[in-house]
A protein has these predicted regions:
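Domain-scale recognition of soluble eukaryotic interaction modules
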Residues: 1-13, 20, 74-184
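N-terminal onset of structured domains
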Residues: 3, 17, 21-59
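Acidic/polar N-terminal loop/beta-strand segments that form early-domain functional surfaces
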Residues: 48-50, 65-67, 80-82
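A generic structural motif
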Residues: 51-53, 66-68, 106-111
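Proline-anchored loop/turn motifs at beta-strand termini and strand-loop-strand connectors
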Residues: 65-75
């Protein structure tokens, strides 16, 4: 039997999903769908890389996982497409999988916030890396690179976009030593 909070979450999530499909964020190049028609708690999302950015021409896939007490608790959002970005975790480990996102709306989630509020912030994130809120390793490697060698950072970001997010990307070809198999 479902508890009240899960039933409420299902209603809220279903309504948000319907709203986003009735009035999609096409001006931002964002679409949402379901991985499985029987599970409203897991969405797939696509974001087109904005023009004149490191991510231009890319098609980025994300997964949105809603908790049973949504909207009282924040959803989990992860990039499934590898992306070289200051505010997206790219290091793969058992406890911190690829693609976790650092954005203010998620970090400062308030009861009643919505995915519709977060999606434009994700699009804005592709316009500009935020060095004040990096999702980085303990040595701040990417942040230092972004600040001290922006040309190299840009090359890496464009490489990742071309390699993993272009329409012709071969998603099974990753740089040596990288294992993204759990995202398939």
């Amino acid at each position: 039997m479902l508890d009240k909070s899960k039933i409420n979450a299902m209603k809220v999530i279903s309504e948000e999903f319907k709203q986003l499909n009735r009035a999609p964020l096409v001006n931002l190049g964002i679409t949402v769908g379901l991985f499985n028609e029987d599970n409203i708690f897991e969405w797939k999302c696509t974001i087109l890389g904005p023009k004149d950015t490191f991510y231009s021409g890319g098609l980025f896939y994300l997964k949105i996982i809603f908790p049973n007490d949504y909207p009282h608790s924040k959803p989990e959002m992860v990039f499934l497409t590898p992306i070289y970005h200051l505010n997206v975790k790219y290091f793969v480990s058992q406890h911190q999988p690829l693609g976790h996102i650092c954005v203010n709306t998620l970090n400062e989630w308030k009861d009643g916030d919505s995915v519709k509020k977060i999606l434009p912030e994700l699009f804005a994130l592709l316009h500009k890396n935020n060095p004040l809120s990096p999702y980085d390793d303990t040595n701040n490697t990417r942040r230092k690179e972004f600040e001290n060698n922006p040309t190299l950072f840009a090359k890496k970001a464009k490489y990742f976009t071309k390699k993993f997010a272009s329409p012709y990307a071969k998603l099974k070809e990753y740089p040596n030593g990288w294992d993204f198999s759990y995202n398939e």
